């Protein structure tokens, strides 16, 4: 039986991180978690990380598509926060962000890690951006590191 697993060292690989400005007070913590994880665990150099800031989560898929089509990156990481409000807006934004990023991953055969927190409350979002429930930006970066190495073996 053959088992394929990916390590997390990705020295020399290039990563793009798409960062939503909406809910920036917690999203910056997600970005910091992603960058620190890439550098510390993946041994990725500063020059191999590109940060692209966009207005919100809805703009992430088209940005990811442009980054993927450039051929410059080994993986893309999306970090942001969408918090439920009193209207259906949450479902539209979160759903389009999730499905759009997934389409980019499959269309371009490229890891696109989802570090966009989608929560019912502000407190839940804060917990997932570096306090009680860990840092989803860091977790997304670990996923990207591993998937770069898994796909390299396939």
UniProtKB/Swiss-Prot annotation:
Its EC number is 2.5.1.78. Pathway: Cofactor biosynthesis; riboflavin biosynthesis; riboflavin from 2-hydroxy-3-oxobutyl phosphate and 5-amino-6-(D-ribitylamino)uracil: step 1/2. It comes from the Bacteria. One of its GO terms (molecular function) is 6,7-dimethyl-8-ribityllumazine synthase activity. It catalyses: (2S)-2-hydroxy-3-oxobutyl phosphate + 5-amino-6-(D-ribitylamino)uracil = 6,7-dimethyl-8-(1-D-ribityl)lumazine + phosphate + 2 H2O + H(+). The keyword Transferase applies. GO terms for biological process: riboflavin biosynthetic process. One of its GO terms (cellular component) is riboflavin synthase complex. The active site is at residue 89. (2S)-2-hydroxy-3-oxobutyl phosphate binds at residues 86-87, 128. Keywords: Riboflavin biosynthesis, Transferase. The keyword Transferase applies. 5-amino-6-(D-ribitylamino)uracil binds at residues 22, 57-59, 81-83, 114. Pfam families: DMRL_synthase. HAMAP family: Lumazine_synth. Catalyzes the formation of 6,7-dimethyl-8-ribityllumazine by condensation of 5-amino-6-(D-ribitylamino)uracil with 3,4-dihydroxy-2-butanone 4-phosphate. This is the penultimate step in the biosynthesis of riboflavin. Belongs to the DMRL synthase family. PANTHER family: 6,7-DIMETHYL-8-RIBITYLLUMAZINE SYNTHASE, 6,7-DIMETHYL-8-RIBITYLLUMAZINE SYNTHASE DMRL SYNTHASE LUMAZINE SYNTHASE. NCBIfam families: lumazine-synth (TIGR00114), PRK00061.1-4 (NF000812). Forms an icosahedral capsid composed of 60 subunits, arranged as a dodecamer of pentamers. This is 6,7-dimethyl-8-ribityllumazine synthase. It comes from Idiomarina loihiensis (strain ATCC BAA-735 / DSM 15497 / L2-TR). The gene is ribH.
């Amino acid at each position: 039986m053959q088992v394929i697993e990916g390590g997390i060292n990705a020295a020399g690989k290039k990563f793009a991180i798409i960062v939503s400005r909406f809910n920036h007070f917690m999203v910056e913590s997600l970005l910091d978690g992603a960058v620190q994880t890439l550098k510390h665990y993946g041994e990725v150099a500063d020059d191999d990380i590109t940060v692209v800031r966009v207005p919100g989560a809805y703009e992430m898929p088209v940005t990811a598509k442009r980054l993927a089509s450039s051929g410059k990156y080994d993986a893309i990481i999306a970090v942001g926060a969408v918090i439920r409000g009193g209207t259906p807006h949450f479902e539209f934004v979160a759903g389009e962000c999730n499905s759009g990023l997934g389409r980019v991953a499959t269309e371009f055969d490229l890891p696109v890690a989802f570090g966009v927190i989608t929560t019912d409350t502000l407190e839940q979002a804060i917990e997932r951006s570096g306090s009680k429930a860990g840092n989803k930006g860091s977790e997304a970066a670990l996923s990207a590191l591993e998937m770069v190495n898994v796909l390299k073996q396939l």
